[in-house]
Structures are given as C-alpha cells and as structure tokens.
C-alpha cells in the first residue's frame, strides 16, 4: 500500500511541499476543501475517509457521485472543474505555462453530492517519456468514477496522440479486463465518457466532431485484442459517449460562462432529459467505503497486479460489513449483558422476549442500514454470520428463561396442590386440573413471550418436560393423599373397634370371637366404602385401588390384633380370669356375696369355679369363631410400605401359644389357691370365737375393783377426768392424730432402748426369716384339713 500522505491544499504560487506538511487553507470551508489523494510520488493519503466525513458525505450511502477529468496538461481541466462544480482546485498561471496539478486531487462540488477528481494531465514535460503514472491514473480514474470527462481542444480532434487516443486505447483495454465479464452477465459496470471540446469556434459543427471522435473510438475498439468470449462485444456495451463543446474562455468569456452553467445543469438537474449521472454508472460503493475502496484499487494498480474490481468490491464489502457488524454487535452485547445475571440467578425476567427481539432487530437494522449498500453476496453472508452470533448470544438467555419458567411453574404447581388439598371436602382431580392448567398456561405464555422471531427455537419440548414433572409431582401428591386417607380410615377403624373388642373380651363367652369378628367386618366394610368413595377423585387405577384395599385390610387386621394383644396382656388376662373366678366362687347364682360357714362345701364350689375359669384360657388363646364364614383371610401380599410384619400372617389367629397357656394356667392356679385359703380362714375364725360365759366370769371377778373405783373420790375424779378428756378428743377428731403421735413416740422409745441395749450387750442385728406365702398357705390348709 502507498505511504500515507495528509491533506494538501497548497496555493498555486507556492512551491510544492509533500502532503504530510500542508495545512488546510483558511480560505476554504470544510465542505469545499480539497485533498490530494495521490501525490506525485504515487502515495495514497490515509486521510480521505476523514475528509469525506468533513464534506458531510460519509452517511450519504449511494446518494453521491464521482466524476474525474482526463486530458492533456495545461488544457484547463482544473478551471473547467472549478466552473462546473464550484471546486477549489489550483489553476495554471498562464504567464508561466507550467504544471499545476500533481498527482490526483479530490474536492466536493459546491452544494452538490459530487466528489470531483482532478487528475494530473498527460503528455507533460515534467514527466516526459514516463507514461507509467498516466496509465495508472487513467486506470484508477476509470475504476473509481462514474463519468470520465475527456478534456480536449477542437484542433486535437482527429489526432491520435494529441487527442489521447493511445491512452484511451489503454483505458478501453483496462475497462474490458475490469468489466468485460461483469457487463456480459448484465450487471453494472458502464462508464460515461464525456468529451468536452474546448475552444470550439463553430466552423466545424459539433455533430461532425462527434462523428469523427466516435469513428476513432470504434476503430480503436476494433483493434483491441479481446478474449474469445468477448470478441463480439461492442464499445456501446461498456461505454456511453456524450459530447459537448465550449467556446473560448477568453475570447468568448460570456458565452463560455453560459455554456458552462448549461453543462452544470446536466450534472445537477435530475429532472432534465440529458441528466448525466445515471444509476447505471454508479459503482455501488457506499460513501463510507469509498476511501477504503480507492486505496485498495490504487494498491493493486501500484503493484501491477491484475485489477479485479468485483473482487475489490467484495473485499471492501467484507471489510466494511465486518466493521458495521462489530459496531452493531458491541451495542447488542451491552444490552444483552444487562439481563444475563438475573437469568443466570434463576429469576424469570418479565418481558425478556420483547427485549431480545428489540435488541436483535436493532442490531440487524443498524447492520442493514449501513451494510446493505455493499456487495449483496458479502452483505448476505456477513448478515447470516451476524444473525448466528446474535442468536448464539440470545440462546442461553432463552434457554435460561425457559429453565427458570420451568422451576417457577413447578413451584407454583406444588403450592397450588398443597393449598387445594387443605380441608376436608376437596376433589383431588379438580385441584390437580386447576393447578396443572395454571402452570402450563403460565409456562406457555412465558415461552411464547421469550421466543425470538426469525429463529427456529421452540419451547414445546421444555413444556413436555414440565408436564412429565407435573405428573410425577401429582402422582406423589396422590400417593401421599391416599396414604393420609388410609391412615385416617385406619384411625377411625381403630376407634370403632376398640370399645366392642374390650366389651366382648371382658365378658368371655363361647361366641365371643364371632361377635368381635362381626363388628370388625362391618367396620372394615364401611372403611372400604369410604376409601372407594374418596378414591374416585384421585383417578386411581384398579391396580392402585386393589393394592390400597389390601393394605387397608391388612392394617385393619393389624389394628385388631394390636387391640386384642393389648387386652390379653398378662396382667389384664389374669385380671379377667380372676374376675371370672370371683364371680363364680365368691358370689352365688343371684350375685349375692357368699359368707362361708363351716358346714359349706367350699371344695366343690372352688373346683367348679376354677375349672370354669381355666376353660377360658383355650378360648382366649386363638381367634376361632364358631361361624367359619366370619374367618378373616388376609391378602397374600401387600405393597403397603407403612406396615411391618411383626408376626407371621399364617399364625396370626393364634394369641397364646401352648407354653403361654400353661404359664397363665399356673399363675391363675396360685391366685385361685389364695382365694381358697382366704375362704377357709374365714370359717376357722368363726369356729374360734370367745364363749359367752367368759363375760359373766369377768363381771363377777371384777365387781370389787369396780366398786372401789366408783366409791373412792380420788379414783372417781380421775375416772371423770379421763372420760371428759376422751370425750373432748373424740369431739375434736383428734383420736387418729393422738394414736399416730403415740405410736411414733413409742417407736422412737423402742428404737433408742434397743440401740442402747445392743451397745451394752454388743449383740448383732438378726435378719427376719423369709416367709414364703404360698407354701405357708398350703401348710395352713393342711393343718385345717
């Protein structure tokens, strides 16, 4: 690439200075300031883009035009441009006749969206035989401009070198290489060659001059070496020709100015029929890419490489589209970054879909606005790349939003289920339906809102996952509610069978188990009906109902066995046996308590009551109803995870084993023997009472002592005092406390006396002999018998 060269706005009469040190003329405004884009050392300036922005054309898009002038040195090219477009190019000092324009300069037309290039003249004495720059500048001008103004004098028409026909031949060859195939496929690439014939005096009509130039151009075209596939192409397929004549600038100054203004109108008036800037001539390079495009062309020209303008346009398009895409993407990333943290934090962002659509639309709109002017293929590819990057940035936000919606809706569903299942009267199916519809509706609305237009994203798959989790949660809730319902039914069943079981076990009878099992079956049937009634709203399957009923039956049986085991524990069953024995031994058939007399047959009554009571032990030992239809058959298996098999189901009717029965029998026998001994003692006490005659003997023998007390004043006074004291103590209720105090004092006196005697005689403390109650009772029974 050519070395940088800054803006050069030097005056005509100042010596030439390299562009790097030339300041902008203070007499030029920013909109008409000129810039040397290529200096005489063939270096391209890096400041063209900045100058285009100063001209106010950077954002013009395609609403601009480029025109270049081509011709011999000192033919008034700069003057013509200044008159036509209001530019500020340096013009020649006619008194010195030296080169004015060096390199290529550019200036914006006054009040026009036109960038005008003033190209160094050909055939100048300064360059002499060096035609390299002439060819390169002609090639550069043709590749860059829409209209190439060929400036020549009238007397040069018909000449070959004087009319620059040799250079035009080079231009034609270059143009054929540049636009041959492109024009053949029907796309743009045409250029207008505007021949401005200067110093026209009118003797030779313009039409004749036009015919001469046209013939010369066609002859040159025919002499070109064309590729085989382009040999039939005509000059008119690539170039449009236009001709105009201007009178002498000095000899006919007024007419010259009027003709120039008329020619200017053809550049300005778009409504004019002979308007020169036709759309077909435009190179379709956006204004903001002109500097980069021209620099690329000049670099190719400088290195003598084959100049492929379509490739240059694509390279420019790639460069500019990448720049535009980067700017749009930077702002887009800043916008997306603001919502990244909330989404990653698990929060559902309200209106995220609208924001993402807005961000994406803004980025694409910004890209389309600035990049759509460039090469369509490159623009389309870069747009697709931009869309892919935008979507890859938004996709995590979209998926995160769906994930957060999923969690939120699942939490809402659980809450709705728990709230709906409170209370007594609820329909599980309705609660589940309302909660599910609400959660799915919320997720669907959020998923639709989060969807970005123009993408192939979908939220239906996530909705299916949510539905699966909702079903799993609902199944767990249904299982929990079913378990709660079974537990409640079980508690009610226990409550209803508790009292009847206690009642029937307390009054043992041969049909005791029939009554207990009948009550149990009735209660269990009611419990099963209650379950089936409530289970309808749970949408339970037949298998689930069967399993639940089996579990309920097993739980009911376990509850019954637990109650029976409670009522047949050792202390309780022995109490029942004692009560049964007492009712038959201590009471007669009418329920009157018996008072045993020596002549009563205690032994027979005892044996009868004992045998009847012992007959109850086998009755209590096994649940065995007389009516076999009342026997309860447990389910073979149960899926109830809340019950444990604490006993063997095959032996569950057995309450007492044979060993247990023998143990209970022995314990009861000992209790019964105690009752028998007690009865025998009561008869012995009645036999050993004091005879009545003893009381008469006591009166006779104690009469004198009684008289002594009664007739002795002292003794009688003490007797009265003792009687009065006893009466007062009895009236005040102090008899018991007095006896208690007396016993306490006596015990304390006895303890201290015993301790003193032990200390005195050093006698050891002897333990009381162990007395065995039952054996002693048996000895006493033997003695009595």
From Swiss-Prot:
Membrane topology: Multi-pass membrane protein
Listed PROSITE patterns: G_GB1_RHD3 (PS51715)
Residues engaged in binding GTP: 71-78
Annotated stretches, region: Disordered: 1-31
Xref: CDD domains: GBP
Bias-annotated ranges (Low complexity): 22-31
Gene3D superfamilies (UniProt xref): P-loop containing nucleotide triphosphate hydrolases
GB1/RHD3-type G domain: residues covered: 61-281
A single GO BP: endoplasmic reticulum membrane fusion
Recorded family membership: Belongs to the TRAFAC class dynamin-like GTPase superfamily. GB1/RHD3 GTPase family. RHD3 subfamily.
Name listed for the protein in its UniProt record: Protein SEY1
Gene for this chain: SEY1
């Amino acid at each position: 690439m050519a070395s940088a060269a800054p803006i050069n706005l030097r005056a005509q009469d100042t010596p030439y200075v390299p562009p790097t040190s030339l300041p902008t003329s203070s007499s030029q405004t920013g909109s008409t300031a000129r810039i040397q884009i290529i200096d005489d050392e063939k270096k391209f300036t890096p400041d063209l883009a900045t100058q285009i922005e100063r001209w106010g054309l950077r954002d013009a898009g395609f609403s601009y035009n480029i025109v270049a002038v081509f011709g011999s040195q000192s033919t008034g090219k700069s003057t013509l441009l200044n008159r036509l477009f209001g530019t500020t190019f340096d013009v020649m000092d006619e008194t010195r006749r030296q080169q004015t324009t060096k390199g290529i300069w550019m200036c914006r037309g006054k009040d026009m969206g036109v960038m005008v290039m003033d190209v160094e003249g050909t055939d100048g004495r300064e360059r002499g035989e060096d035609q390299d720059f002439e060819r390169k500048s002609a090639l550069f001008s043709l590749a860059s401009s829409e209209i190439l103004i060929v400036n020549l004098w009238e007397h040069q028409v018909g000449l070959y070198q004087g009319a620059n026909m040799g250079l035009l031949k080079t231009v034609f060859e270059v143009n054929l290489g540049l636009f041959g195939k492109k024009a053949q496929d029907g796309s743009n690439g045409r250029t207008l060659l505007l021949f401005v014939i200067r110093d026209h005096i009118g003797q030779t009509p313009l039409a004749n001059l036009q015919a001469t130039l046209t013939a010369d151009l066609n002859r040159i075209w025919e002499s070109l070496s064309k590729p085989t596939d382009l040999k039939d192409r005509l000059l008119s397929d690539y170039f449009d020709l236009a001709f105009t004549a201007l009178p002498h600038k000095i000899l006919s100054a007024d007419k010259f100015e009027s003709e120039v203004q008329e020619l200017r109108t053809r550049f300005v008036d778009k409504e004019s029929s002979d308007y020169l800037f036709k759309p077909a001539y435009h190179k379709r390079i956006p204004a903001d890419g002109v500097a980069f495009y021209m620099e690329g062309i000049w670099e190719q020209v400088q290195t003598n490489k084959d100049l492929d303008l379509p490739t240059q346009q694509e390279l420019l398009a790639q460069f500019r589209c990448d720049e535009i895409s980067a700017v749009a993407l930077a702002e887009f990333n800043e916008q997306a970054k603001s919502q990244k943290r909330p989404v990653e934090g698990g929060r559902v962002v309200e209106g995220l879909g609208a924001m993402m659509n807005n961000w994406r639309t803004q980025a694409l709109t910004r890209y389309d606005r600035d990049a759509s002017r460039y090469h369509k293929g490159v623009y389309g590819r870069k747009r697709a790349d931009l869309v892919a990057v935008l979507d890859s940035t938004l996709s995590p936000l979209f998926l995160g939003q769906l994930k957060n919606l999923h969690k939120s809706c699942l939490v809402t569903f659980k809450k709705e289920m728990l709230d709906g299942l409170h209370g007594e009267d609820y329909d599980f199916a309705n609660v589940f339906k309302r909660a599910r519809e609400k959660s799915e509706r919320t997720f669907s609305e959020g998923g639709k809102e989060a969807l970005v237009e123009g993408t192939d994203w979908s939220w239906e798959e996530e909705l299916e996952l949510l539905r699966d989790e909702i079903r799993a949660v609902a199944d767990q809730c249904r299982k929990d509610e079913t378990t709660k319902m079974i537990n409640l039914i079980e508690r009610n069943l226990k409550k209803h069978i508790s009292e009847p079981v206690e009642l029937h076990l307390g009054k043992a009878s041969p049909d005791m188990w029939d009554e207990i099992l009948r009550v149990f079956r009735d209660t269990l049937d009611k419990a099963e009906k209650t379950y089936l009634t409530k289970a309808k709203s749970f949408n339970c399957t037949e298998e689930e109902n069967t399993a639940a009923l089996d579990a309920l039956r097993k739980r009911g049986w376990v509850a019954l066995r637990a109650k029976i085991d409670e009522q047949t524990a050792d202390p309780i069953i022995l109490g029942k046996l004692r009560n049964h024995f007492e009712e038959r031994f201590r009471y007669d058939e009418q329920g009157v308590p018996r008072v045993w007399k020596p002549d009563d047959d205690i032994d027979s009554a005892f044996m009868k009551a004992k045998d009847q009571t012992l007959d109850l032990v086998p009755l209590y030992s096994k649940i065995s109803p007389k009516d076999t239809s009342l026997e309860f058959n447990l389910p073979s298996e149960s899926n109830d995870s809340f019950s444990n098999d604490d006993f063997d189901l095959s032996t569950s009717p057995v309450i007492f084993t044979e060993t247990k029965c023998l143990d209970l029998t022995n314990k009861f026998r000992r209790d019964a023997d105690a009752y028998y001994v007690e009865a025998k003692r009561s008869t012995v006490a009645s036999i050993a009472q004091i005879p009545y005659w003893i009381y008469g003997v006591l009166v006779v023998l104690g009469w004198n002592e009684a008289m002594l007390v009664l007739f002795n004043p002292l003794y009688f006074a003490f007797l009265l005092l003792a009687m009065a004291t006893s009466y007062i103590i009895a009236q005040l209720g102090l008899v018991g406390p007095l006896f208690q105090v007396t016993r306490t004092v006596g015990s304390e006196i006895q303890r201290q006396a015993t301790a003193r005697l032990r200390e005195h005689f050093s006698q050891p403390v002897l333990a009381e002999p162990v007395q065995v109650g039952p054996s002693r009772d048996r000895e006493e029974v033997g003695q009595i018998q």
